[in-house]
């Protein structure tokens, strides 16, 4: 490490009088250069792969879980109610193993405990992932980075949706019967992806510490520390972003969790067809998220993009609720809208809070989102058991409508307060250059 530090410091940075010039680090090993940052970005993306793969295990195996464990829809959706970087990745692995063991020993309560532990790690892992992103990438790069992270996460979800049913069938053929043992072994096989993400977390933690030392980055050098009392200083714009996040995702994740049976019952799809259309949101978001990230980077106007995404999502839910049109249309629209919203919404947090509060802000946003999802997931299961899918779709449409109201309010609040959330990319870049020059000559 000492040699690496001398390589970055240059001829004047070492002990005076060294005759031989220091050897420069290769680009891929130099944290100040693009190839190394791209390596870090790849690790960030894979950090959430295993978590997202295992997060949607219940959705991919809904009929098998309900049949093998003999639970109704409301009880099944409790698996989605406790959604909560090395420690967080370990939580994910332990939670997935306990979840699988619960099925092996035919104890649904143990499966719920496993999902609770998985949530502690999985959602804290998402906060760590977001904090890493804003630490390594700034300004116009941020939308693309969030898009790439979402893309890899959705690839994990898509692979899960399309392969877990097949794995269950192969395990069933191997054991010669269905039941809780078949389900448990299938879930253990799926948990292998968590070990892969844990390895990425370990490497990323090392690279981040190494970069801190090589680039002389000091934590908290301004004297400001991350603390929960930061919450009271959050602006109205940030709170509206929280509301948009909660209400929007409440109409996406619980819907996908219940979507397979919805398409079987309303549109008479086969189990395989239902799994395919239920995963199309994630299939679309995988390639489209980086594209939208670049688009938002180039254009700016984040609020307008969020508004378009919310309106499109509302239209797709209304189509699914009140028409018998080909559901592929609505689901493709939902996939496009979901990709666009994530690329435009999450980076806005970095525009409205100081850098030292980013960890607190993203953590609070994730916590509120998961509290909302916990309540909505249980409510959705109860509505489905008692009222059916039409009422459930109306409920999801109402959630998106609340998100739409919050977006409109955010637009006017941002306009009246002179905020920068809806600036064009050119204007933001110009003002950032002016601010940088002012700091240079201070």
From Swiss-Prot:
It catalyses: L-alpha-aminoacyl-L-arginine(out) = L-alpha-aminoacyl-L-arginine(in); L-arginyl-L-alpha-amino acid(out) = L-arginyl-L-alpha-amino acid(in); L-arginyl-glycine(out) = L-arginyl-glycine(in); L-alpha-aminoacyl-L-lysine(out) = L-alpha-aminoacyl-L-lysine(in). One of its GO terms (molecular function) is dipeptide uniporter activity. It is a multi-pass membrane protein. GO terms for biological process: dipeptide transmembrane transport from lysosomal lumen to cytosol; protein localization to lysosome; protein stabilization. One of its GO terms (cellular component) is lysosomal membrane. PANTHER family: MAJOR FACILITATOR SUPERFAMILY DOMAIN-CONTAINING PROTEIN 1. Lysosomal dipeptide uniporter that selectively exports lysine, arginine or histidine-containing dipeptides with a net positive charge from the lysosome lumen into the cytosol. Could play a role in a specific type of protein O-glycosylation indirectly regulating macrophages migration and tissue invasion. Also essential for liver homeostasis. The dileucine internalization motif is required for lysosomal localization. Homodimer. Interacts with lysosomal protein GLMP (via lumenal domain); the interaction starts while both proteins are still in the endoplasmic reticulum and is required for stabilization of MFSD1 in lysosomes but has no direct effect on its targeting to lysosomes or transporter activity. This is Lysosomal dipeptide transporter MFSD1. It comes from Gallus gallus. The lineage of its organism: Eukaryota, Metazoa, Chordata, Craniata, Vertebrata.
């Amino acid at each position: 490490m000492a040699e690496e530090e001398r390589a970055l410091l240059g001829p004047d940075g070492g002990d005076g009088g060294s005759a031989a010039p220091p050897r420069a680090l290769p680009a891929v090993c130099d944290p100040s250069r693009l190839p190394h940052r791209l390596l870090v970005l790849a690790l960030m993306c894979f950090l959430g792969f295993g978590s997202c793969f295992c997060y949607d295990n219940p959705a991919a195996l809904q009929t098998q879980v309900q049949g093998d464990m003999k639970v109704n829809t409301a009880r099944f959706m409790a698996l989605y109610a406790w959604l909560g970087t090395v420690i967080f990745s370990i939580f994910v692995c332990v939670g997935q193993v306990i979840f699988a063991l619960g099925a092996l020993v035919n104890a649904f309560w143990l499966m719920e405990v496993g999902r609770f532990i998985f949530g502690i790690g999985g959602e804290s892992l998402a906060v760590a992932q977001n904090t890493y992103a804003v630490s390594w990438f700034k300004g116009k790069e941020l939308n693309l980075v969030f898009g790439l992270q979402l893309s890899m996460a959705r690839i994990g979800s898509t692979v899960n949706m399309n392969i877990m049913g097949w794995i269950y069938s192969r395990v069933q053929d191997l054991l010669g019967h269905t039941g809780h043992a078949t389900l448990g072994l299938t879930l253990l096989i799926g948990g292998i992806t968590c070990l892969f993400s844990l390895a990425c977390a370990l490497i990323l933690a090392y690279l981040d510490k190494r970069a801190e030392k090589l680039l002389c980055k000091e934590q908290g050098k301004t004297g400001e520390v991350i603390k929960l009392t930061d919450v009271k200083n959050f602006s109205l714009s940030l709170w509206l972003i929280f509301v948009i996040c909660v209400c929007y995702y409440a109409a996406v994740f619980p819907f996908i969790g219940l979507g397979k049976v919805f398409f079987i019952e309303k549109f008479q799809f086969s189990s395989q067809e239902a799994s395919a259309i239920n995963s199309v949101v994630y299939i679309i978001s995988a390639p489209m998220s980086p594209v939208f990230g670049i688009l938002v980077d180039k254009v700016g106007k984040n609020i307008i993009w969020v508004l378009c995404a919310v309106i499109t999502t509302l239209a797709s839910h209304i189509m699914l609720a009140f028409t018998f049109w080909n559901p592929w249309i609505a689901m493709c629209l939902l996939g496009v809208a979901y990709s666009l919203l994530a690329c435009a919404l999450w980076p806005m947090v970095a525009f409205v809070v100081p850098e030292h509060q980013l960890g607190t802000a993203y953590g609070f946003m994730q916590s509120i989102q998961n509290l909302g999802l916990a309540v909505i997931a249980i409510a959705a299961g109860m509505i489905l058991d008692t009222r059916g899918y039409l009422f459930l779709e109306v409920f999801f449409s109402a959630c998106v409508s609340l998100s739409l109201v919050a977006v409109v309010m955010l637009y006017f609040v941002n306009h009246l307060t002179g905020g920068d959330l809806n600036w064009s990319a050119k204007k933001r870049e110009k003002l950032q250059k002016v601010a940088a020059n002012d700091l240079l000559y201070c």
